[in-house]
Swiss-Prot record:
Gene this protein is translated from: lyrm1
Family label: Belongs to the complex I LYR family.
Single GO cellular component term: mitochondrion
Name by which UniProt lists this protein: LYR motif-containing protein 1
TM region positions: none
Pfam families given in the database record: Complex1_LYR
Length: 122
């Protein structure tokens, strides 16, 4: 993390914890609220810890944009979990063929900004 990006990253980190503290589940049930609050805190810790070694300013900007998008989507839909998306299937292409590489490229392009930190599960 560089000196220029540090305040923004720390602001986002604190903002997530403030949101988690005030979070109410859409169902109104206390056990779901507690579970969702724990998920928000655990997810933030996991992703910030995973990305703490990043020093490239462009990559840090991507991560902060992803964080902002996740916050906005979570608050708008009142759902702390990432929204499911449809990714193009890989089909029956051989793993080292041009078709497979083209399909991989399409899958990466189709992935929205708020899911860049998630690994591919197909």
């Amino acid at each position: 993390m560089t000196a220029g990006t540090r305040p923004e990253v720390l602001h986002l980190y604190r903002q997530i914890f403030r949101i988690a503290r005030k979070w109410q589940a859409a169902s109104g049930l206390m056990e779901e609220t507690i579970k969702e609050r724990e998920y928000i805190v655990d997810e933030a810790r996991k992703l910030f810890h995973r990305n703490k070694q990043i020093t490239d300013v462009a990559m840090i900007k991507e991560c902060t944009e992803e964080c902002k998008a996740r916050i906005e989507i979570g608050l708008h839909y009142r759902n702390p979990y990432p929204r499911p998306i449809h990714l193009p299937p890989l089909g029956l292409a051989l793993p080292h063929s041009k078709v497979f590489r083209a399909q991989e490229k399409l899958r990466k392009q189709a992935k929205p900004v708020y899911l860049k930190s998630y690994d591919e599960i197909s």
